[in-house]
Amino acid sequence: MFTQFDVLETIDMVEREHLDIRTITMGLSLFSCVRSTAEETAKNVYDLVCRRAEKIVKTASELSGEYGIPIVNKRVSVTPVSLISAAFPEKAPLIGKALDEAAATLGSDFLGGYSALVHKSTAAYERTFIKTIPEVLASTQRLCSSVNVGSTRSGINMEAVKLMGETFKAAAKLTAEKD
């Protein structure tokens, strides 16, 4: 049971100290979406994300109203796209755009997962995928990307670090006009 002090302290934190919940996240596996073509996979990805996360914004609003604490961002996070696009990495941007469209349909602030896990080594399909990141980030609004290039156990994949330097430079060039 909450005491009167607890309630007043919470109100004070929300009003004077601007307490909020920065982000709520729903994680989804996309492995069931993989098909023989990028186009079919992208369609399945869009459908699955829209179906499974359809209530994320409504639920966040209800929770915020119930507890009186603002929830700033609603985010969906998915399986790293490099894993589900391994058979057609040059067409991975189709999946990225489908994810961005799904985020817009849901009203989600961000959708994370246009990502690769190359901390141990970098396969040819992963290099090809990583080279698509600048194009995808330049042509989407809500999609987030990440590349894991190291870990305590595996060390740092310096080949991947070099590739990411080139990728950052290309992304900066393509998005120079954006804020």
Give the predicted meaning of each segment.
Residues 2-131, 147-166:
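Metallocofactor- and cofactor-centric catalytic cores in central/energy metabolism, strongly enriched
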Residues 134-137:
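Acidic, His- and aromatic-enriched active-site or binding-groove loops in soluble protein domains
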Residues 159-179:
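Extended, Lys/Arg-enriched charged tracts that mediate electrostatic binding to polyanionic substrates
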